[in-house]
Amino acid sequence: SIAVAFVPEGLPIAVTLSLTIVANKMRASEVLCKSLSTCETLGSITVLCADKTGTLTKNNMVAVSVTVHGFKSTPVDATKHIERDTPLGSAFKQVQFVGAVCNGASFDGATAHLPLSERKIYGDATDKAILRMSEEMYGVPAANAGWEDHYTVPFNSKNKFMLKLLSTSNKAGISGLNDSNTVDLTTELCAVGLVGIFDPPREEIPSVVKMIRGAGSRFFMVTGDFALTATAIAKQCGIITTEKISSFSDLDALDGQLPVYDTWADNDNQPMRALVLSGSDIMRMSDAHWEAVSRFDEIVFARTTPEQKLAVVKCFQSRDCVVGMTGDGVNDAPALKMADVGISIMGASEVALESADLILLEGFGSMVDAMLYGRLVFSNLKSTIAYLLPAGSCSELMAILAAFFFGLPQIIGNVQMIIICALHDAICSLTLCMEKPEGEMLKSKPRNVKKDRLADGKLLFHAYVFVGLPLTVCCFSMAFWDVQKRGVPFSDMWLKYSGGVIATTQPDFYAETINKGQSVFYFTAIIMQWFNLLSIRTRRLSIFQKPPIGRRETSNLMMFPAMGLSLLIAVFISYVPAIQRIFLTREISAEYFFLPIAFGIVMISADELRKYVVRTYPRSFLAKIAW
């Protein structure tokens, strides 16, 4: 009985269903959670590392310029030079030729009838841009005519190059590649020209970065692109906001001068500290360098390999940060798997999608909604636990302890305990996951996973002492009052471990009277929990400031049907004769419906007074112990 009483059996049900409901709400916001635990972890992210291409940018690369011999031109003007067969035209034609034949992308033949800008291309985004430029300048089929592709070394993020062996001669004259001459092929190359490619940032990214930083999380860029390119995009996206940008050479000089970054401190008035590092810098970094890096506010990691992205994640995790990592490529998979929350975007590679914990179905803009839901679900779960404990644990446990220490009859049946926890409280608690934020959650700091717990001392004090004890006293008073009115005085139960005179001489009458008293206890707990449900919705605000009905931005209309369903279940269990015999329940008088309502009004009024003191006197004792 003690185990049944102390453990709120509805808690696992309520928590699991709450997380499931929140995950479905996130799905409606185009955010797909692959595990329920991810919903809660999202709210505690302190460092978010974002890939550039496809995440911060549109991944819609367009070649906007071609440069040869120091002469810069647009692809359209370069085409005119080719048509006029000028010396510059010959140079531009070489660029066009290399772009067409040394390319891993290919056009979809089914879209050949469409305008060039609408034709579908298979391949890497960079290859697509160059192939489209080559088609615009002279035509890809003309460039490929007469050439055979004998050997290809595909591009990978570690080598950062791709090789193609082309020839018009007999295949018999071609010698195979080995490790030694592969190295030779990467040296003494001839620069044919430069192609400028533009991949515009997504319009929503600057505001998203600002909101995530406003929520107390640091936002970094981790990309395989060149440092200057990454820095330029970072400035456009608002990732770097200061003019002074440190580099690897500055880390030694800054050793010991930078204060440790405290996520939960007031950093608003501190000057921003920016840093740009390349993959080659990361290879040379010591633990002291990593310690210095962890203290910067704005960081761009450029030209990184998969191993280096993984090192970045581990660096911040080892310093008690909760790391979120976004990525869409195969090379991002190790870092996505290692991060506390791996985030990918719809359209990413299969490997990235498989490795991620969270998939953004409509671009990176929905990341703000994901973080908001992560914080909201934690807050609502705390409310759920605070709601479940008074009736589902405190009052039931006191009934068992009273029977053990004071010889009283167990005034609530074991089956009724389980029904209260698994049905009544579970049904009503599910409405708490529908609650809207009490304040602006994305303007507060992320929770500290090492200090902030779902059920801390303040919450337990509120649930067991401030709410649980008054509820228990009311339930006991009502139940034993009914028993005494039916002819069994309290003195005949007090310290009568084996039953008093009536229990001995009239056992059937005594058992029936106790069963009716248990039903009174049962209904009193259920009805008073309604008022606990209305009160537990807020921690600081009054019920009039956040009404459950009448105001769209604060309403929770599911509460009242849940209360009604809870009462219907109790009536069904207690008033249907066949069910009465199974659960040992009995019908109760009308007065036992209305008196708990009066007690509940007193209880919610007391909590309103407590909240008023907490709001008005934030340094008071009540404010310090408020959950």
Predicted regions located by residue number:
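Alpha-helical transmembrane segments and their helix-start/interface "positive-inside/aromatic belt" motifs
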Residues: L459-Y464
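Conserved cytosolic headpiece of P-type ATPases
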Residues: S1-G457, L469, Y522, R539-W627
